[in-house]
Amino acid sequence: MYYRTRTYIAGDWDHDKDAVEALHRWNESSKYGLSFSDAHELKQAKDTSLNCSIKRSLAERLDASKTFILIVGDHTKELKAGGCQYCGSYNSYRGTCSRGHTIDTRSYIDFECEKAIRDGLKIIVLYKSTFVNRDKCPEVIRWKGIHVPMEKWIGNTLYLDYDSVRNAIGQ
């Protein structure tokens, strides 16, 4: 059992990793006032080959979190990774797991969002864009929490908007 003191960051790690890394840079820098304890610093899944093992590990991290941040980019809504149907242990003919685990066809993102809502975490949705486009957000969390863009134009240059992110997180 953990105390709920951490911040859980979810997103498309293949396409939006730069936004996640920006949050970590702002958190680690003495120049910025962002301050959070990352839930992903807790233990990792022992068997990362099984989606159910990874989801168990994600659930433990969410159990230690008070804030859930979802970074929404161009591909977030379409992510499918994490569903049992993509695991080698899934028997599509029978719709069962050959290892005896419960079947969960949700993606990692949908799993994380649903658990954050169910657990009553503070929800912050950061759009890797200059505007909020809820159509890009997973449906389960589309109308929950605080939604803000995390980019802004200054002149002809696109920047990450630290102030917008900090205000959303409430620090």
Placement of each model-derived feature along the sequence:
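Conserved N-terminal substructure of TIR/SEFIR domains
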Residues: M1-T67, G170-Q171
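Surface-exposed, flexible loop/turn segments at secondary-structure boundaries
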Residues: H15, T76, F131
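Short aromatic-enriched loop/helix-cap "lid" or pocket-rim segments at secondary-structure transitions
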Residues: E21-A22, G83, D135-E139
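Conserved BB-loop
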Residues: S30-S57, D74-S89, R94-I103
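Short, well-ordered beta-strand core segments
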Residues: F68-I69, I123
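Amphipathic helical hotspot of TIR/SEFIR-family domains
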Residues: L79-R134
